[in-house]
Swiss-Prot record:
Molecular function GO labels: ribosome binding; rRNA binding; translation initiation factor activity
Pfam families: eIF-1a
Organism of origin: Burkholderia vietnamiensis (strain G4 / LMG 22486) (Burkholderia cepacia (strain R1808))
One GO cellular component, as annotated: cytosol
Known partners and oligomeric status: Component of the 30S ribosomal translation pre-initiation complex which assembles on the 30S ribosome in the order IF-2 and IF-3, IF-1 and N-formylmethionyl-tRNA(fMet); mRNA recruitment can occur at any time during PIC assembly.
Keyword Cytoplasm: yes
Domain S1-like: 1-72
Keyword Cell inner membrane tagged: no
Keywords: Cytoplasm, Initiation factor, Protein biosynthesis, RNA-binding, rRNA-binding
UniProt gene name: infA2
Compartment list: Cytoplasm
Protein name per UniProt: Translation initiation factor IF-1 2
InterPro entries: NA-bd_OB-fold, RNA-binding_domain_S1_IF1, TIF_IF1
Role: One of the essential components for the initiation of protein synthesis. Stabilizes the binding of IF-2 and IF-3 on the 30S subunit to which N-formylmethionyl-tRNA(fMet) subsequently binds. Helps modulate mRNA selection, yielding the 30S pre-initiation complex (PIC). Upon addition of the 50S ribosomal subunit IF-1, IF-2 and IF-3 are released leaving the mature 70S translation initiation complex.
């Protein structure tokens, strides 16, 4: 059996929810629920509200997606690094 086809879409994180879940607005205006992929959790990649992300959506359920990539924008906020004091 072949692996199911996935749709790759870009969106912007609107809200960070508990349990590593997010509310994302896609480029076409549709709002979907999403979760961070295992690779992103393993590498401690932080996703904040306002970040531009790439999602994978199943063709069977277009209301939930998996965040695969957080785009690096020059104006996106950066979380403080561990061990550094804020000034």
């Amino acid at each position: 059996m072949a692996k199911e086809e996935l749709l790759e879409l870009d969106g912007i994180v609107d809200e960070v929810l508990p349990d590593s879940k997010y509310r994302v607005t896609l480029e076409n205006g549709v709002v979907v629920g999403a979760y961070a992929s295992g690779r992103m959790r393993k590498n401690h990649i932080r996703i904040l509200a306002g970040d531009r992300v790439t999602l994978e959506l199943s063709v069977y359920d277009l209301t939930k997606g998996r965040i695969n990539f957080r785009h690096k924008d020059a104006n996106s906020p950066r979380p403080p690094r561990a061990g550094q004091a804020r000034r």
